[in-house]
């Protein structure tokens, strides 16, 4: 067992809750102890939903373990059926509830409800949240759409001449990263192509809507982590092809439009010609040259991580120095993507490994989840969130999709704004030695007082002063500091000044390498010559 203060994915029953919460008129009866009701907060507090998830917990306590917990589950199921009157019900157990082995599926079926009751058997200690969402959606589609399936060997009828093509949008759930706005953007894009959306599922769909899935001509898979298993089943049973391209980024959206147009038998060129996106021009304009070769580290779910790496490399000119995911089921896809950029994929669900990798690679921008935001803040690196799990600020009130052409505009703004603008960098370099604007100087309107103890220069350089040195008033009268390396080597003032000429984003690495070189070679005082000797040594 591994104890941790953070997890990228919850247990699989949280994935089932995401599907149930996204749908309408579906209820989830969960055999779980009192402590597992915490999951409600994910939806009401973080996603800011205005109603509780459609989940009934049995909430058994320790005192109930000596009684009939099966009867407790059956009573909860009866009450949920009578109170909420759902069109369908899913039943299962949480990770703790599964240890009792009460068989919620069998118990619920024995109650003889007049609605479909779908047992969701999730291996709580082998799988995690995204797998639980995928399995739940697959079981729902199979149980509810299955009775409408054509007989084996039946050919799919041709669409009538002049009839608009129809598709299903598969994969969006509650608690997903920008799923609400992605649905709107992709529906609008498909409408421009003359394609109607038949059903969006799970989000917004009812069990009755799932019976109509087979009426579509093809399926659009927006989030493979949730929808790929169900889409494969629909292709096999209903002979519906499904899309493989995820429309995140300008290039991917153009490929998606062509792929969808091919499935629907329509011309994509008018839509592509009229596409409104500013990312290509902004990223090629003169004032965006500072983006070129910015080192970026990317970590998230496989769908968003792979798409983000492509945008970073091909559309913004960044250099991808790290790529990883917590989705082990999609590890092969991420490894293949990482190979294109000449990096080794990081497949892990341990945030400490991710933090160590970020510290090792010294990126200039981190793209990740809520945890990578914390990691980047600790390391002083700009960050943008690209993937779930996310916190409340990534469920904005405004329209902010990630998919489609408008999603590309949102991505450009989100990623570029945390970076230091080229003009700012130029001005900092120009005035870094100015008496008024140098590190540690007080704002001019505050007069000549002591520099604040938390000034950036004081944080960056450890100052070694003689114990007998007097305390002088006025920032201008402070003696020149002599930095001390952690290894014991002392930085000479001229070497410290030379170090400041190195660009800020690699200055920390240069300092560490020089101190390491001095320590290994027994150098007591780091001079300018030592600095360049270290540079030559590590450049070999």
Curated annotation (Swiss-Prot):
<dbReference type="GO" id="GO:0016636">
    <property type="term" value="F:oxidoreductase activity, acting on the CH-CH group of donors, iron-sulfur protein as acceptor"/>
</dbReference>
<dbReference type="GO" id="GO:0046872">
    <property type="term" value="F:metal ion binding"/>
</dbReference>
<keyword id="KW-0547">Nucleotide-binding</keyword>
<keyword id="KW-0411">Iron-sulfur</keyword>
<dbReference type="GO" id="GO:0005524">
    <property type="term" value="F:ATP binding"/>
</dbReference>
<keyword id="KW-0560">Oxidoreductase</keyword>
<dbReference type="InterPro" id="IPR016209">
    <property type="entry name" value="Protochlorophyllide_Rdtase"/>
</dbReference>
<keyword id="KW-0149">Chlorophyll biosynthesis</keyword>
<dbReference type="InterPro" id="IPR050152">
    <property type="entry name" value="ChlB/BchB/BchZ"/>
</dbReference>
<dbReference type="GO" id="GO:0019685">
    <property type="term" value="P:photosynthesis, dark reaction"/>
</dbReference>
<keyword id="KW-0067">ATP-binding</keyword>
<keyword id="KW-0479">Metal-binding</keyword>
<comment type="function">
    <text>Component of the dark-operative protochlorophyllide reductase (DPOR) that uses Mg-ATP and reduced ferredoxin to reduce ring D of protochlorophyllide (Pchlide) to form chlorophyllide a (Chlide). This reaction is light-independent. The NB-protein (BchN-BchB) is the catalytic component of the complex.</text>
</comment>
<keyword id="KW-0408">Iron</keyword>
<feature type="binding site">
    <location>
        <position position="36"/>
    </location>
    <ligand>
        <name>[4Fe-4S] cluster</name>
    </ligand>
</feature>
<feature type="active site" description="Proton donor">
    <location>
        <position position="287"/>
    </location>
</feature>
<dbReference type="InterPro" id="IPR013580">
    <property type="entry name" value="LI-POR_suB-like_C"/>
</dbReference>
<protein>
    <recommendedName>
        <fullName>Light-independent protochlorophyllide reductase subunit B</fullName>
        <ecNumber>1.3.7.7</ecNumber>
    </recommendedName>
</protein>
<keyword id="KW-0004">4Fe-4S</keyword>
<dbReference type="GO" id="GO:0016730">
    <property type="term" value="F:oxidoreductase activity, acting on iron-sulfur proteins as donors"/>
</dbReference>
<dbReference type="Pfam" id="PF08369">
    <property type="entry name" value="PCP_red"/>
</dbReference>
<dbReference type="InterPro" id="IPR042298">
    <property type="entry name" value="P-CP_red_C"/>
</dbReference>
<keyword id="KW-0077">Bacteriochlorophyll biosynthesis</keyword>
<keyword id="KW-0602">Photosynthesis</keyword>
<dbReference type="InterPro" id="IPR000510">
    <property type="entry name" value="Nase/OxRdtase_comp1"/>
</dbReference>
<comment type="pathway">
    <text>Porphyrin-containing compound metabolism; bacteriochlorophyll biosynthesis (light-independent).</text>
</comment>
<feature type="binding site">
    <location>
        <begin position="422"/>
        <end position="423"/>
    </location>
    <ligand>
        <name>substrate</name>
    </ligand>
</feature>
<dbReference type="GO" id="GO:0036070">
    <property type="term" value="P:light-independent bacteriochlorophyll biosynthetic process"/>
</dbReference>
<comment type="similarity">
    <text>Belongs to the ChlB/BchB/BchZ family.</text>
</comment>
<dbReference type="InterPro" id="IPR005969">
    <property type="entry name" value="Protochl_reductB"/>
</dbReference>
<comment type="subunit">
    <text>Protochlorophyllide reductase is composed of three subunits; BchL, BchN and BchB. Forms a heterotetramer of two BchB and two BchN subunits.</text>
</comment>
<dbReference type="Pfam" id="PF00148">
    <property type="entry name" value="Oxidored_nitro"/>
</dbReference>
<dbReference type="GO" id="GO:0051539">
    <property type="term" value="F:4 iron, 4 sulfur cluster binding"/>
</dbReference>
């Amino acid at each position: 067992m591994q104890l941790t203060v953070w997890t990228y994915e919850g247990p699989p029953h949280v994935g089932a809750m995401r599907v149930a919460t996204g749908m309408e008129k579906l209820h989830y009866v969960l055999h779980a102890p009192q402590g597992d009701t915490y999951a409600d907060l994910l939806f009401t507090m973080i996603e800011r939903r205005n109603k509780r998830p459609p989940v009934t917990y049995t909430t058994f306590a320790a005192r109930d373990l000596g009684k009939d917990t099966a009867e407790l589950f059956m009573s909860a199921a009866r009450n949920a059926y009578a109170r909420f009157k759902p069109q369908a019900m899913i039943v299962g157990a949480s990770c703790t509830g599964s240890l009792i082995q009460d068989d919620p599926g069998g118990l619920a079926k024995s109650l003889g409800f007049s609605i479909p009751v779908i047992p969701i058997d999730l291996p709580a200690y082998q799988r995690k949240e995204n797998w639980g969402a995928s399995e739940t959606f697959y079981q729902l589609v199979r149980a509810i759409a299955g009775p409408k399936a054509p007989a084996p060997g039946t050919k799919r009828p041709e669409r009538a001449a002049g009839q608009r093509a129809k598709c299903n949008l598969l994969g969006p759930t509650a608690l997903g990263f920008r799923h609400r706005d992605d649905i709107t953007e992709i529906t609008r894009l498909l409408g421009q192509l003359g394609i109607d959306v038949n059903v969006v599922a799970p989000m917004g769909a009812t069990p009755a809507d799932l019976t109509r899935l087979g009426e579509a001509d093809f399926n659009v898979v927006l989030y493979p982590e949730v929808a790929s298993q169900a889409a494969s089943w629909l292709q096999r049973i209903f002979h519906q092809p499904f899309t493989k391209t995820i429309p995140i980024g300008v290039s991917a959206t153009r490929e998606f439009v062509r792929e969808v147009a091919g499935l629907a038998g329509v011309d994509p060129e008018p839509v592509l010609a009229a596409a409104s996106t500013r990312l290509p021009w902004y990223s090629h304009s003169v004032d965006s040259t500072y983006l070129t070769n910015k080192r970026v580290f990317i970590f998230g779910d496989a769908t968003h991580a792979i798409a983000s790496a492509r945008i970073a490399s091909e559309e913004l000119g960044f250099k991808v120095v790290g790529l990883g995911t917590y989705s082990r089921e999609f590890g092969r896809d991420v490894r293949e993507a990482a190979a294109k950029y000449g990096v080794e994929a990081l497949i892990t669900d341990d945030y400490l490994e991710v933090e160590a990798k970020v510290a090792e690679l010294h990126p200039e921008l981190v793209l990740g989840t809520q945890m990578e935001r914390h990691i980047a803040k600790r390391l002083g690196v700009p960050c943008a969130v690209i993937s779930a799990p996310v916190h409340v600020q990534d469920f904005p009130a405004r329209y902010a999709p990630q998919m489609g052409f408008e999603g590309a505009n949102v991505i450009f703004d989100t990623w570029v704004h945390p970076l230091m603008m080229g003009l700012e960098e130029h001005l900092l370099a120009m005035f870094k030695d100015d008496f008024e604007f140098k590190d540690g100087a007080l704002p001019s309107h505050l007069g000549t007082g002591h520099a604040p103890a938390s000034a950036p220069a004081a944080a960056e350089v450890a100052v070694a002063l003689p114990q007998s040195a007097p305390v002088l008033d006025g920032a201008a009268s402070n003696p020149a500091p002599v930095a001390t390396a952690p290894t014991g080597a002392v930085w000479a003032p001229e070497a410290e000044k030379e170090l400041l000429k190195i660009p800020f984003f690699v200055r920390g690495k240069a300092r560490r390498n020089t101190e390491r070189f001095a320590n290994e070679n027994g150098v007591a005082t780091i001079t300018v010559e030592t600095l360049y000797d270290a540079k030559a040594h590590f450049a070999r």
